[in-house]
UniProtKB/Swiss-Prot annotation:
FMN binds at residues 53-58, 68-69, 75, 97, 132-133, 177, 187. It comes from the Bacteria. The lineage of its organism: Bacteria, Pseudomonadati, Pseudomonadota, Alphaproteobacteria, Hyphomicrobiales. Catalyzes the oxidation of either pyridoxine 5'-phosphate (PNP) or pyridoxamine 5'-phosphate (PMP) into pyridoxal 5'-phosphate (PLP). It comes from Allorhizobium ampelinum (strain ATCC BAA-846 / DSM 112012 / S4) (Agrobacterium vitis (strain S4)). Its EC number is 1.4.3.5. Its cofactor is FMN. This is Pyridoxine/pyridoxamine 5'-phosphate oxidase.
Length: 206
């Protein structure tokens, strides 16, 4: 996609954020080298100190943006404590960015179970073996845990650990950014006062 194609077309005419996000994500899937669903996830600890890391978006709809993790990890404990988070998608191939922030809820057990069973066997075993975000004495200790859980679940299905599930970020703001010449970028932000309220669209200075 050429620079001219990237910066033509007025996406700022859109009046609803989820449809626009779906369009941009679809285009990113065609242009990004890998992981077009990779997103920076920001959380804060009890002192207000932020943490950020990359996760993979696994689902989204009008209700929000879903990813899965170990609830005993740093991000898991911070989200369960604060009930808020932010995300930032950056697609370099498209020169586009989407930022969002909002309230967070835990997905249903049915949703988590369904997604968990789609994961490779090694990933399901890893969810049991890894005490995510806690000190690890050696690589051997991790590999030993993997071997132990592999043997335990050699026959039959691998159940989802109680500490492993998904979060849904229900955005209160979603901002779309597109690169422009001379740093004169295009930015629009969709805002709502509360969940369930209508969106208000604001064009922003770059």
């Amino acid at each position: 996609m050429s620079q001219n194609e990237l910066t033509t077309g007025d996406f700022t005419d859109e009046h609803e954020p989820f449809g626009l996000f779906e369009t941009w994500l679809t285009e990113a899937k065609a242009s990004e080298i890998n992981d077009p669903n990779a997103v920076a996830l920001a959380t804060v600890d009890e002192s207000g100190l932020p943490n950020v890391r990359m996760v993979l978006l696994k689902d989204f709809d009008q209700n929000g943006f879903v990813f899965y993790t170990n609830f005993e990890s740093q991000k898991g404990t911070e989200i369960l404590s604060q009930k808020k988070a932010a995300m930032c998608f950056h697609w370099k191939s498209l020169r586009r960015q989407v930022r969002l922030r909002g309230e967070v809820e835990v997905v249903s057990d049915a949703e988590a179970d369904a997604y968990y069973q789609t994961r490779p066997i090694g990933s399901r075993i890893g969810a049991w073996a890894s005490k995510q975000s806690r000190p690890l004495e050696s690589r051997f200790a991790l590999e030993k845990a993997v071997a132990e859980y592999t043997a335990r679940y050699a026959l039959g299905s691998i159940p989802r650990p109680a500490h492993w599930s998904g979060f849904r970020i229900k955005p209160l703001t979603i901002e779309f950014w597109r690169d422009g010449k001379f740093r004169l970028h295009d930015r629009i932000e969709f805002r709502r006062e509360a969940l369930g309220q209508p969106w208000n669209k604001v064009r922003m200075y770059p």
